[in-house]
Amino acid sequence: MPLELSPVTVPKPWGREIWYSGVEQRGVCSFACGGGHSPIPWLQAVVPDSGLGVAAEPLVLLKILDPRPQPVVGDLYFELHEEKREVYVVTGIDPVAWPGGQGGNSAGLRSPAPADYPDQQAFRQAYLRAVQAYEAVRRELDGLAGQGLAPGPEQLEQERFLREAMNDFTYLQPVAVGDVVTVPLRVPHSLQHGVRTIEFQTPVYERKILSFAQQVQTQDHWDTAEAVQSMLLEAPPQPALPVLQQGEGLRVERVVDFPDFEVRRITLQGVARLDLEAGQHYALLMVVAGSLRLGGAAFRAEQAMLLPRGWAGVLESAQAAQPLVLLWAVPRR
């Protein structure tokens, strides 16, 4: 039977994350069972044949990123990953932050003045100098805050000037509701304020922070000097999603096909139904829009569940007048 995932909210300097399948020191998600909650590792340990995933091995990490709508304080870390694979599906754009309906995601770098840099290495070093100049004033402001002191107008103006000079090197990718954003390894990226997404990622804590316009809480240093040498400067274009299945009121698209997990988007309209099997691994299922009827229950947007290994059933809308959009993820091992 499907097991609903009970989310955990994790505060962040830029907003919050809502975890559905995370198990680590910062939070342990649970299965909603019989009116109560059972932590994911507990139930994994007692279900035979790894039906809910291998005990002591993390599930594919499913979460919602919910940044604040205000510029700067709602922008995520500008960071890159060397092992962790990520994909975002945009579900909301704050209308005050982005009146035109298109939000932003910083992805890779661009040259503010191409003629000034004879080669790629010169460009990397110019970017590093811009970040280090901003980091110096950032640490000065953080030190004042730690003493309960407020910065003066000149310090605030210097922070703004150096932050904008640093950000001139980054490429801002426009995103809208429904867009899929695949984050390639070693590409610096930063989801911007007011852009709400569903994220699937490799369940490892690994990153290099290039910059952040607030005080970093999790480490006492930035990794810019090291990251600049290995980073990819440009993010490849986002490819069109392959359509795996299409029929009357039915569309199944492949969102990503990573070495460690796959994600598909399923859209059902009217009375369309889809027969589906979890196969040899568990599957994660998240409702993006509409209402799903499954296992005698109805699930609404931003509710998620784990389907045990070997599960088979029918996906259908609980409200035929409204399209049903789902995200389905399965591990590769």
Language model: regions and residue ranges:
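Short histidine-centered beta-strand/loop micro-motifs
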Residues: 73-81, 273-279, 296-297, 316-318
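His/acidic/aromatic-lined binding-pocket segments of jelly-roll/cupin-type domains
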Residues: 79-81, 86-89, 172-173, 180-181, ...
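Ligand-binding loop in jelly-roll beta-barrel domains
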Residues: 83, 93-95, 187-206, 298-300, ...
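Short acidic-glycine-tyrosine-enriched beta hairpin
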Residues: 170-182, 293-314
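C-terminal amphipathic alpha-helical segment
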Residues: 206-279
